[in-house]
Amino acid sequence: MGQVGFGQPDDGIIQMAYVVADLRAAIGQWIERLRVGPWFVLEHFTGEHPVYRGQPSGAAVKLAMGFAGHMNIELIQENNNAPSVYREVIERRGYGFHHFGVATWNFDAAVAQYEREGYALAFRAAVPSGGRVGYMDTTAVLPGFTELIELGGAFEEVFGRFYRASIAWDGKDAIRSFI
């Protein structure tokens, strides 16, 4: 097992994600209460070729990423009410923790392993960093989904840029563009 550029283990947890009702308000609380920042915001995300529970997905979200130490934090707000892994959690228990992000160099093998263990692939899509993500439904045994995040492509550049910005962040320029 190695490490990704921001210090977390590859094939380990690199991200904690939360669904929120109001992205800007949530960012404000993370900055004020937890001193996490800066935040990189993507106003509209659907993924490329998104599939939810075996069907094409029309779900759209806005999201923000920041770092607390070496851990990536993702905040997610729905842009619509389309069926999605986000809507599932909100309807089941409200806003709050949603998923663990786990890095993997071998995405297909990781998905297959989870499926062999009985966990369904609830959502999959290609992402702007050039990789793929897959949300495995681990909600029966963990407090949320497990998102498999494919390493490679522009992953290190994108996440590395966010991480480097968080080191000795002075509280200025708290909200920045994701792209």
Language-model segment annotations:
Residues G12, P128-R132:
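Short acidic/glycine-enriched loop/turn segments that link adjacent beta-strands
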Residues T46-P50:
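Short, charge-patterned binding micro-sites
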Residues H44-F45, N80, P128-S129:
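Conserved beta-strand edge residues that scaffold enzyme active sites
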Residues M1-I14, Y18-V41, R53-A120, D137-I179:
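Glyoxalase I/VOC metalloenzyme domain signal
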